[in-house]
Swiss-Prot record:
Cited SMART domains: DnaJ
Family: Belongs to the HscB family.
Subunit structure, interactors included: Interacts with HscA and stimulates its ATPase activity. Interacts with IscU.
One record GO biological process: protein complex oligomerization
Function: Co-chaperone involved in the maturation of iron-sulfur cluster-containing proteins. Seems to help targeting proteins to be folded toward HscA.
Keywords, alphabetical: Chaperone
Organism in which the protein naturally occurs: Buchnera aphidicola subsp. Schizaphis graminum (strain Sg)
Domain J positions: 2-74
InterPro entries cross-referenced by the UniProt entry: DnaJ_domain, HscB, HscB_C_sf, HscB_oligo_C, J_dom_sf
Protein name (database record): Co-chaperone protein HscB
Amino acid sequence: MDYFALFNLPKKYIIDKFLLSKNFYKLQLKFHPDLFIHHSESKKRIVLQKSIEINKGYKILQDSLNRAIHLLFLNGFKISKEKVLSEDNSFLKKYFFLYEELDFLLKNNCDEVQIDIFFKKIRNKIDNYEKIIEIKFNEKKWDDIIKLITKLLFFKKIQTRLKQS
């Protein structure tokens, strides 16, 4: 499924999120299951499936990492984290060092300032990777994008863990 086509958006890494939301709500108004309660069971199933597809597509396009993975998929590529990471041991070492730093901060009840500094460091790394990914998409440098997305995934995991703490 091409979610860019579903939401009538250009197939680009950077999207107009306002337009995405606007088109999402238009589709929801058209395919919301509650609007079909008096229709046949088969029609209800079709509409429910379409609604699920719309919600899934919206979530994918809202998130920069998932949007990048979807764009790669549409261009015939699939990410294999294991293959990419096995080729870049230096990144894995840096990542594990950051994860150890995060564990230390969380286990030692460090103050909010230290955690905030670490969070900003991770946010900056994510922002930098996203900017580079945008450039690489424009250049159609698929192999570079795959490597960058795999690294971005790790920083997003650290960010998620920080937000949950």
